[in-house]
Amino acid sequence: MSELSQMTLKILYTLDNGSNGSYLARSRAPKQVRVANIPSPFPTDSNEQTELRIGAIHLKTILHEIYLNSPEVLDHDTLKDGYDYNLYYRDICEVDEPLVSLGLLSGLRKKFHKNSPYQYTENNIGEEESEERDEVTEEEYEDESFIVTGRVCSNVSALLRRSYSNISNKKGRVVNNQIPEETLEVKLRFTKVITNLRTSGNNTTNSRISCLQMPSSLPSATLPFTPKSQSLFKTNQIKNSRNARTTITINNTNSGTVGRRQTNPMPAPKAVRTQSLPIWNLKPNIANTGFPRNSIAHKIYLADRKTEANQQNNQHQNIAYEINTLQNDNTIQRTKIDDSVSKRFDFMLNKRKSTKKVSPGIATIAKKPASININPKQPPKTSGEKKANDKQTIVKVKNSNSKNSAKSTQAGCRRSSVIEHLNDHDDSILSDILSEPGIEGQKLQQKQKGRKISLTSENDKENIPPQSITSKENKLEGDLDFNAEFPMSDFSDVVFKDEMGWFSNFNCNFFESPTSASASQLNQQNLKPSITLNDPNTCNTIALENEDVSELETAQNNKISLPSDVDKTSPIDSLSIPLIELTHSSSTTNMQRISIKEGSTLNITDSNNATPCDNDIKDRKASVIDSDNTKPQAGLINFSTPADQPASDNNVTASKKLTSMLETQQSKRSHEEVLDEEEEEEALKKQKAIPSSPCGMFNYHQPMELSEDIVEEEQGHNIGDDNESDKTNDLFSTFIHSGIRVSQVVTSPIGEFQSIKH
């Protein structure tokens, strides 16, 4: 048998299969529950049968408590979001407590609101609860499908409340002690179900719309909700309507009023393109564009290509400047650069250029080099032709020099003809220059104008050719005097015989050569021409002798200074010296004869005006010539000042003796010269050693030719001694001989140095 009792509700429910956890809702006021005792379905160890106390309550009361405790979990506008909940409860009367479905939450709400005849007010809560209980119990009997069963258990929280209430009674407070000791425990599960408004029929849409109309159509008194839950319901409804972004017109046939249209307060974003190409591929046409010519897709394609081209043209790229220290920044050239050769660097200059223009006549005069035509009939010769002619004349002169002395007369004629030709050539040049004195003034004016032009056209130097130096402008022309009379006879004998012979005719002030210096110093110190001077500039600091004594004797007889070691500064020069010395021998005879004749005539002329002191000097010179014929004959030439005193007979006789002595000596030498020259040539050809070698410095194995006086003295002292002849070959023979012997015979550098001192 069942009975009615008052107890509180304890509701345990889960959402989405328990993924979000379990929830608990308690009722604040006790509810009327029908309680019954049934046998327990769970078997026990003992055969004794136990009873189970259960309670039954209506589903509407349970949902109301859930809405009051957690309104955010179960929303009334779930259908607008496109989903719904299916409601299950656990039946404790069956074994294992299975879940029993009660239907969709939206359908249950519809039934509860239609069949609720009671009203809810805040003033008479107790009365309404009593009436509610009575009405619920009546409905439970009418419809048992919405009855939910649960287990009746003890209320632990009620025991705590009783202890708290007893303490409060002792303190004088009045507390309601009507708290039930038991509670009803009900277990529910809400499972989400996805719904679609478009696919559903008219009935479902109407039912859902009516469900949405529930808050507006029904008065607030008819709803079993509190004002707090009602306000929360309105806020959630507005929120979901914004998210759904749908407008629903509600037509109420009973009232005849039209609902307001809901709009989105947020503005919609602007469309970038109004038309778009299809995603599928069309067949290409003849133009291979992929779209028909008159179609909208083709127009869109062309518009897209046009916009892409404009975007590429409008893209501005920043200019990258790269400036180096050695290079100007030419990214933006404000000045135009001239490409000509002479003005390719003018853009680097900051100064302004002069804008003066030169007349073309003056420019042509400045550009043309001055030239003088010697022969007006003949065209001017080029430099190549002039060089060739000069070479031919030089070759002819050299060939004439290399001939023997027998052909000297013919060579002299040829040389004179060549020199006369050259003199005629020079005279023609001088006559042309001197005959036109007015032309020189014009040329000076042209030079001044050319200088002005060169100043105005500094920047155009490369385009103007350099002016050639004329014969008048040459510096050597001012120094040389062409009108002076040259001694062409002496010039022909000296210049055209050998290449280096003309050095002796020049003064040492002009050319300070080793040969000229050595010649002057030999005359001052009365040294042998074979001895080399101490000249650090030519690396000759030790005096050396010639290779042979016979060469020295011939040199003294011919009065020619043979090339010494001063000229032999390299192996190449030393090898070429014997060939040069061969040419000297052929040309020395004529010069020696000429010099002797000139010396004799000068002495004869001077002897008439000489003083007694001069006569003594001449006697000494004659004795020297008689004693030693190998000394140079240049000492016979005496240059004295003319005197007005009358000449004596002694001077005349002395001069006659000198001339007779010279003629006899010259006649003897003329026969011996030919043989001596041939021997010298053969000795020089055989000689292969370098003159500066020890073999040439010290004649170790060659017997030395001593003078006749020394040989006679040695024979007088040592008549039977044969070993004395070997002393001449000794290297240190200079140390044994003393006095005059050492001064006459020099076999080593030390002995030569001692002879110079004596």
From Swiss-Prot:
Q: Give the sites modified to Phosphoserine.
A: 454
Q: Which UniProt keywords apply?
A: Phosphoprotein
Q: What is this protein called?
A: Protein SPT21
Alphabetized PANTHER family for the sequence: PROTEIN SPT21 (PTHR39147:SF1)
The gene that this protein is the product of is SPT21
Q: Which spans does this entry mark as compositional bias, Polar residues?
A: 626-651
Look up the coiled coil feature and give its residue ranges: none
InterPro entries (alphabetical): Spt21/Ams2
* Gene Ontology terms: cellular component: chromosome, telomeric region; nucleus
Annotated GO biological processes are: rDNA heterochromatin formation; regulation of transcription by RNA polymerase II; silent mating-type cassette heterochromatin formation; subtelomeric heterochromatin formation
Q: What does this protein do?
A: Required for normal transcription at a number of loci in yeast.
Q: What is the lineage of its organism?
A: Eukaryota, Fungi, Dikarya, Ascomycota, Saccharomycotina
Q: Where is this region: Disordered?
A: 251-271, 372-414, 438-471, 624-651
Point to the regions of Low complexity compositional bias.
395-408
